[in-house]
Design a protein with these regions (language model features):
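A short acidic, Gly/Pro-enriched loop at the edge of an enzyme's catalytic core
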Residues: 130-140
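Conserved class I S-adenosyl-L-methionine
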Residues: 67-76
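A short glycine-rich, Lys/Arg-flanked "PGG" loop and its adjoining helix->strand segment in the class I
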Residues: 85-86, 158-177
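Short glycine-dipeptide loop
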Residues: 67, 90-91, 175-181
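A short SAM/SAH-binding and catalytic strip from SAM-dependent methyltransferases
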Residues: 138-162
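S-adenosyl-L-methionine
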Residues: 106-130
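Core SAM-dependent methyltransferase catalytic element
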Residues: 215, 232-257
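Class I SAM-dependent methyltransferase Rossmann-like catalytic core
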Residues: 33-61, 65
Length: 257
């Protein structure tokens, strides 16, 4: 079960507390997030990933729902894009955004999803110039990719000169005031900032929080559903013994008006 923290007005907190005190906790029941995960026809590889990533709990924090316009930033094969497509429904729209590097790393596996999902559009764009209208998004997802903005490799397809400040400024431009940003990433040790982004592919949680707050976003919620206290936060995330076993932070921000 996720440990969820949301900022609610005092009156709503009082009502919630009274409800639990009088009636007890509500029995678990399926909602649109569970329904999205249970949707027929999802690829087998996605179902295996569900056991590690707990997508219903993560997406529930975002509040994404029918008719919304959502971007999945550096979506790779589009695992989350497909789930969001079910949440927003036929009147909503999902942008599956990759740059050339993420298209290459995903081996273009997003193509099958786009063919099946009429409300999902794939775009290959530079991360500093997303090509979307200003204030056009109800929500944006950054799932285990934010740390890459601070990675400056000497070789490979990832751009060597990405300006993280410019990318976050662009993200703030396209998310409408009041819109939501859902952030998930691999935890680095506290106080390390972005130092481990290029080596371990991790980033410090509080550094991430300050980064988004400095670009016009307010933290409004968090979840411990992907926490792994046994992770020493000293090993690389995408290969070796830590694959699927990393401590990950989950935060949701709201674009300030």
């Amino acid at each position: 079960m996720s440990v969820l923290s949301l900022r609610l007005p005092p009156l709503l907190l009082a009502v919630a507390a009274l409800t639990v005190a009088v009636f007890g906790p509500s029995p678990a029941r399926a909602d649109r997030y569970d329904d999205a995960v249970a949707h027929a026809g999802r690829p087998g590889g996605d179902l295996k990933r569900d056991k590690i990533d707990h997508p219903a709990e993560v997406l529930r924090l975002s509040g994404i729902g029918p008719s919304m316009v959502v971007a999945d930033f550096l979506a790779a094969d589009g695992y989350y894009s497909e789930l969001v497509s079910y949440l927003v429904g036929p009147k909503g729209h999902v942008y599956l955004l990759n740059n050339e590097a993420y298209d290459k790393w995903s081996e273009n596996q997003w193509q099958g999803r786009v063919e099946r999902l009429p409300n999902v559009a794939h775009e290959t764009v530079p991360v500093e110039h997303l090509g979307l209208p200003a204030r056009s998004l109800d929500a944006m997802l950054l799932i285990k990719v934010y740390h890459d903005l601070y990675w400056h490799p000497d070789e490979g397809p990832w751009p060597k000169d990405i300006d993280a400040d410019a990318v976050l400024t662009e993200i703030a431009r396209v998310v409408k005031p009041g819109g939501v940003l859902l952030l998930v990433d691999h935890s680095a040790k506290p106080g390390t900032g972005s130092a481990d982004a290029g080596t371990l592919h991790r980033i410090d949680e509080q550094y991430a929080r300050r980064d988004f707050e400095n670009h016009g976003f307010e933290l409004v919620g968090s979840s411990d559903v992907l926490r792994r206290p046994d992770d020493p936060r000293e090993l690389i995330t995408y290969k070796g013994e830590m694959v699927g076993k990393t401590d990950r932070f989950v935060m949701v921000f709201r674009r300030q008006r």
